[in-house]
Regions:
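S-adenosyl-L-methionine
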Residues: 1-20, 61, 65-73, 108-163, ...
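Non-catalytic nucleic-acid substrate-recognition regions in nucleic-acid-modifying enzymes
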Residues: 1-102, 340-396, 405, 410-411
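Short amphipathic alpha-helix with an adjacent loop that forms part of the alpha/beta core around
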Residues: 46-51, 258-265
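Residue-level signal for inorganic ion chemistry
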Residues: 59, 106, 271, 291, ...
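A short catalytic or substrate-binding loop motif that flags glycine-/basic-rich loops and adjacent residues
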Residues: 107-109, 329-331, 375, 385-388
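Conserved S-adenosyl-L-methionine
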Residues: 138-260, 283
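Internal alpha/beta scaffold segment
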Residues: 145, 414-415
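Conserved Class I SAM-dependent methyltransferase catalytic core
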Residues: 220-222, 226-239, 250, 260-261, ...
């Protein structure tokens, strides 16, 4: 997203954006046909109007071309141009440091370079409260995006409660509480890079900070977060306390089968495990079936959101999703399944006896063949070969890939 912004607007974004990843100020664009032209383009810019020669800086360079094939080398060219500019105009040179006050970002595309200043100096998902994290943490801005897609700000105003029954380090519940409290995520940090920017106005920034603090409210919402692992709950409690919402969230350690009815209406949002390998996915089917059962028994009239990478696992829940949204959890493409839990959205029978037999057979074959393949150093082998006549296909595993091939049907099928 690009646009024009005043200093007031920049400070508002730094304080209030829950979804953004970086906040960059574009300084200039110019030609970069080769390293000499890149140097000239960057050396002639008035860098002393951006930061002082007393500040340390570093350069991030992204992109290559036929002439500039190495990002590290191109970044060094930009760095040299900046240093030489300061030396010529001020008689001093700024230092270069990996933990620099100022971060210059260069993007090269089609022999054109765009130079920007990273106004914060860190990814905006790093709110600073999550120093404790579980095995598969979800980024704060992704958690916030899921909540926005589930209309959580609107639901919170209408008195809906919130629950995450697989909370891990508590990120989703914490972001939900911060949203409902109208707490600006930027208030949690005071180390923004723009403090070293020449156009920074400390008094104006403090004015916006105080205005943001004044907007914090005590929401009329109950927050529930649980997990099967005790250490995860302790981590989540510590994270929530650092975020300033620990007093709002009821944390508990409990397995899924001990989940009880919480309230009449609310939003349930979870990020359950989703295996990236065939065997792992099949092992997770019972968990997703149990989730569907729990939704029906304990979350009737709630809105539910489930983030998963596998449509097969989503189908195992047994409830119809009225909307899906595409996301990336890190490098994994996922879908957010939005489900209204109500009497009309019945729990469907997701498989027959035969399909359960098929799943059991594939799991059994995998358990046996996986150990054998590891001992033999083999990555390619057949997992299933029409073992059950009703499912006449073969499944072959090639490293991380799976190929399914259907057998030709017989010319005549006996009546």
């Amino acid at each position: 997203v690009t646009g024009d912004a005043s200093l007031d607007c920049i400070y508002q974004i730094a304080l209030w954006s829950r979804l953004a990843n970086r906040l960059h100020l574009v300084l200039f664009s110019g030609q970069a046909y080769n390293n000499q032209i890149l140097y000239q383009t960057c050396q002639q810019f008035p860098w002393q109007t951006v930061f002082s020669d007393q500040s340390a800086f570093k350069v991030h360079f992204h992109g290559t071309s036929n002439a500039l094939r190495n990002e590290m080398y191109a970044g060094q060219v930009v760095k040299d141009a900046i240093v030489d500019h300061f030396r010529h105009h001020t008689g001093h040179r700024p230092s270069v440091d990996k933990d620099a006050d100022i971060q210059v970002v260069a993007y090269l595309k089609y022999d054109q370079v765009t130079i920007s200043l990273d106004l914060l100096g860190y990814s905006m998902h790093q709110r600073s409260y999550r120093t404790e994290q579980g095995m598969a943490p979800i980024k704060e801005n992704l958690a916030a995006a899921l909540l926005w897609r589930m209309n959580w700000p609107k639901l919170a105003k209408e008195g809906y409660d919130f629950a995450d029954i697989m909370c891990g380090s508590g990120t989703i519940a914490i972001e939900a509480a911060m949203m409902a409290s109208r707490m600006a995520p930027g208030l949690l940090r005071q180390d923004q890079a723009f403090h070293h920017w020449t156009h920074h106005q400390p008094s104006l920034w403090e004015k916006h900070r105080q205005a943001a603090k004044a907007q914090v409210v005590n929401p009329n919402v109950r927050f529930f977060a649980s997990d099967t692992k005790g250490f995860a709950i302790e981590q989540a409690k510590a994270n929530a306390a650092r975020a300033g919402v620990g007093h709002l969230i009821e944390f508990s350690q409990r397995p899924l089968h001990q989940i009880q009815n919480l309230s009449e209406k609310g939003l349930l949002l979870i990020n359950p495990p989703y295996g990236e390998r065939l065997g792992e996915q099949l092992d997770l089917i019972p968990l997703y079936k149990e989730m569907g059962k729990i939704f029906n028994e304990h979350f009737m009239h709630w809105e539910a959101g489930v983030l998963t990478s596998d449509p097969m696992l989503a189908k195992a829940i047994g409830l119809r999703a009225h909307k899906t949204y595409a996301f990336f959890n890190g490098s994994i493409p996922c879908q957010l399944y939005c489900i209204s839990v109500n009497p009309d959205n019945h729990l469907r029978q997701t498989d027959s006896g035969h399909t359960q037999m098929l799943a059991n057979r594939i799991q059994k074959n995998l358990a046996h063949l996986k150990k054998w393949a590891e001992r033999q150093g083999i990555e390619c082998y057949r997992v299933y070969d029409a073992d059950i006549p009703e499912y006449a296909f073969a499944i072959d595993k090639y490293g991380e890939y799976v190929v399914l091939q259907e057998y030709m049907p017989p010319k005549k099928v006996p009546e």
